[in-house]
UniProtKB/Swiss-Prot annotation:
Gene that specifies this protein: leuA
GO cellular component: a single term: cytoplasm
Name by which UniProt lists this protein: 2-isopropylmalate synthase
Main location class: cytoplasm
Species, as recorded: Streptomyces avermitilis (strain ATCC 31267 / DSM 46492 / JCM 5070 / NBRC 14893 / NCIMB 12804 / NRRL 8165 / MA-4680)
Family: Belongs to the alpha-IPM synthase/homocitrate synthase family. LeuA type 2 subfamily.
EC number(s) stated in the UniProt entry for this protein: 2.3.3.13
Length: 573
């Protein structure tokens, strides 16, 4: 088919394609991520600096406590040399002996100036586990425009900064602190690979990584500039060419300028990265840092333990929204208000059938649904695993069909409607949504269902109200039913005979001019135990109409008679 799109007048001449990596024998596409990486949350640093209203100390502490509770073991807590607020916060969590668990490492950021480095290391005095994170920009545009320096001069900034970190750590910190070092060639995505490698090697020459002396080399996509696959190529190239690789923790720090930060991080792991830096829900400068929640839940959905607890994802969201003063989008993966919700009729039908199949499979194996592999269409994970209920899984509007409506009735009211009754009732709901528009809530669905099918003692409707009924069976097996009822407002006694109570009731109705023919009948219990109620569903042909009725009662015979009354009264409505 021909492409009928037309060229635009947009100034594409201002931009050039991103340079590809010459790595013909790349191996990362064949790799799989089978264990969680090391995670670092930079919500309190990179995330906080991007807020319109940066966090107060109280909000910072609440965010820190949340990250610890979730299981993050590396947390970047600020830029203490940038101002007194960040410095005081770092000191406050160090001096509070209950704040930082023994297995949590705090990290602080600094530029490569001596006064800033000294102040940064000073903020860490008394910390149990701490890392200084030093960075300087290495990309050509920064060398030319910002620093106006040569490659050697830029490299020397990194070398001198690393040397100063070592000197001040030895001078200011004591044996109480397990000290680590991280270096980032900022704007790695726009830095020549051979130069990025050269700078990292020079930094390692100063730090001297070895057994029990790891170095973290963080390669940030400070601005996302390429496809995730090209980003992965760059990581594989660096991982292959770094010396002392066994003592290097190779870290990825994607931003989301092209909207592919999650994919970039995942492919970087396949290409050799050991660690990911990001923020909850993708907070951060411009389009944000990579989203740690999506990354962790992506692993979870593939059967890989993220080693971070997302079991109460709404609590995580509420805390993040409070601390950041920014809302999480309703469509945000795994956590948004609508991500486990289907409005489409075909989706809802598939979801309902998926739940039914899961229950049947579990019952056949003698286990619970939680013990078998999750397999429900349109739901990549079980919402219960992150603390969500099934209440919002199916919501009804004008695009919805029978499956969604039936799901609501079964899930909320234990009524498992027969398929043709589902179709009948969905048309009733469709009429309502077409007339009124918008969403129909589960409460609305139940109200319409009650009004359509079930008797209302406070506002009776229909020709017949049954008061009592009694069945006897003669020696030939013929049932005789005697019913005390109100017909068209007049109390009367109806009697009929037949093969079973329903047939006998049909015969009794003939005496008041109501001709009923049975088309289908089904019933089920609504719960377990001696006091369980039964739901009976009956499809009848009544005076040329085909209608369903429902009856609910602890006695199955009474339930079936109520179902007949429901259908008959609907026919006369």
């Amino acid at each position: 088919m021909a492409n009928r799109q037309q060229p635009t007048s947009m100034p594409i001449h201002k931009y050039r394609p991103y340079e590809q990596v010459d790595i013909a024998d790349r191996t990362w596409p064949d790799n799989r991520v089978t264990v969680a990486p090391r995670w670092l949350s930079t919500d309190l640093r990179d995330g906080n600096q991007a807020l319109i209203d940066p966090m107060s100390p109280a909000r910072k502490r609440e965010m820190f406590d949340l990250l610890v509770k979730m299981g993050y073991k590396e947390i970047e807590v600020g830029f203490p040399a940038s101002g007194q607020t960040d410095f005081d916060f770092v000191r406050s969590i160090i001096e509070d002996e209950t704040a930082i668990p023994d297995d949590v490492t705090i990290s602080v950021l600094t530029q490569a100036r001596e006064d800033l480095i000294e102040r940064t290391v000073e903020s860490l005095v008394g910390a149990k586990r701490a890392t200084v994170h030093l960075y300087n920009a290495t990309a050509p545009v920064f060398r030319r425009v910002v620093f106006r320096g040569s490659k050697d001069q830029i490299k020397q900034i990194a070398v001198d900064g690393t040397r100063l970190v070592v000197e001040y750590a030895e001078k200011l910190l004591d044996e109480r602190t397990t000290f680590g070092y991280q270096y980032s060639p900022e704007i790695f995505t726009d830095t020549e690979l051979d130069f990025a490698l050269e700078v990292c090697e020079a930094v390692m020459d100063v730090w001297q990584p070895g057994p029990d002396r790891e170095i973290i080399l963080n390669l940030p996509a400070t601005v996302e500039r390429s496809t995730p696959s090209t980003h992965a190529d760059r990581f594989e190239w660096m991982s292959r060419n770094l010396s002392r690789r066994e003592y290097v923790c190779l870290s990825v720090h994607p931003h989301n300028d092209r909207g592919t930060a999650v994919a970039a991080a995942e492919l970087a792991l396949m290409a050799g990265a050991d660690r990911i830096e990001g923020c909850l829900f993708g907070q951060g400068e411009r389009t944000g840092n990579v989203d740690l929640v999506t990354l962790g839940m992506n692993l979870f959905s593939q059967g890989v333990d993220p080693q971070i607890d997302f079991s109460n994802i709404d609590e995580v969201r509420r805390t993040a929204e409070y601390c950041n003063q920014m809302e999480v989008h309703a469509r945000h993966p795994y956590v948004g208000d609508l991500v486990y919700t289907s409005f489409s009729g075909s989706h809802q039908d598939a979801i309902k059938k998926g739940f039914d199949a899961m229950e049947a499979d579990a019952a056949a194996k003698g286990v619970t649904v939680d013990d078998i592999e999750w397999a429900v269409p349109y739901l990549p994970i079980d919402p219960k695993d992150v603390g969500r209920s099934y209440e919002a899984v199916i919501r009804v509007n004008s695009q919805s069909g029978k499956g969604g409506i039936a799901y609501v009735l079964k899930n909320d009211h234990k009524l498992d409607l027969p398929r043709r009754m589902q179709i009948e009732f969905s048309k009733i709901i469709q009429t309502k949504t077409d007339a009124e528009g918008g969403e129909v809530t589960p409460k609305d669905i139940w109200a319409v269902f009650q009004d359509e099918y079930l008797p209302n003692p406070r506002n009776p409707w229909g020709r017949i109200q049954v008061k009592t009924g009694q069945t006897t069976t003669d020696k030939d097996g013929v049932d005789t039913l005697t019913v005390e009822a109100s017909v068209d407002g007049v109390d009367t006694v109806l009697t009929g005979s037949g093969n079973g109570p329903i047939s006998a009731f049909f015969d009794a109705l003939q005496s008041v001019g109501i001709d009923v023919r049975l088309l289908d009948y089904t019933e089920h219990t609504m719960s377990e135990g001696a006091s369980a109620q039964a739901a009976s569903y009956i499809e009848c042909a009544i005076d040329g109409q085909v209608l369903w009725g429902i009856g609910i009662d602890a006695n199955t015979t009474r339930a079936s008679l109520k179902a007949v009354v429901s259908a008959v009264n609907r026919a006369a409505r």
